[in-house]
Amino acid sequence: MMDLYGRGYSDNPNLPQTDELRATQVIELMNNRGIKKASIVGLSNGGRIISKIADIKPDLVKDLFYVASSGFYSYDEVEDKNVYQEEIDNMILKYPEMAKGQVNDFFEGDKYPNWITQYEELQTHAGFARALISTTKNLVTLDEVHMKIDSLNIPVYTFWGEFDNVVVYDEFKDRLNKVFPNRKEYFISKSGHLPH
C-alpha cells in the first residue's frame, strides 16, 4: 500500500494529476523494490492507474484486478486543466458534505462509524483539494489502453458491488465488453462501491 501524490501522507507537488503520473510512481516503487512482475489491484480510480501501468510497462504485470473501477467511463477532455484558487476554496467549503457522503460508498455505512473521521484526516493535508480537482480535470477515456492490454493477453479480473452507486456498471458495461471481452468477472452481493 502506498500513498500517491496528493493523497494521504505523500508529497503533493503542484503537478497535473494524470493517470501517467500515478502509474509512474507505482512503476518507480516496483523498480526500487526489485519487483520484476506482479499481480496489480486497483480500487475505484486505482483501476485507471493499473491500466496505465500495463500500458507503460506491460512486462511488469502478471495480471490485473479491477475492483469497482471508474476507468471504463468515457470522458470529454477538458481544455483548461489548470486548478484555480476559487475552485479549491469552493471544494474546501464542501469538505464536511464530502466526508459524510463517503459512508454511502458502503452497502451498510453504519457499520463503519469511524470512516467519516478517517476521511476528514485526509482532507487536512495541504493540497488535497487541488489534487482531487486536478485528477478530475485530467480524466481521459482509456479505451485504447484497454484494447492494448487485451491484445497483450494480460489476464484481467473485474469485481463489482451489486449496490455500487458511485461506479454504476450498467452505464459502461457495453464499453467494457468491447475492450475486455476475455475478462473474468465477479459481482459481490451486499456490496456498495467499497467492498468491505
Question: PLM features: residue spans?
Answer:
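Active-site loop/oxyanion-hole signature of alpha/beta-hydrolase fold enzymes
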Residues: L4-V41
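Active-site acidic short loop of glycosyltransferases
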Residues: N31-I40, P58-D59, N153-I154, P181-N182
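Catalytic nucleophile loop
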Residues: G42, G46-G47
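Conserved alpha/beta-hydrolase catalytic His-Asp/Glu region
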Residues: Y75-K81, I92-S151
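Short beta-strand/loop motif that positions the catalytic acidic residue
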Residues: L152, T158-W160, D164
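Conserved alpha/beta-hydrolase "acid-adjacent" motif
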Residues: N165-E171
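Catalytic histidine-centered segment of alpha/beta-hydrolase-like enzymes
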Residues: S191-H196
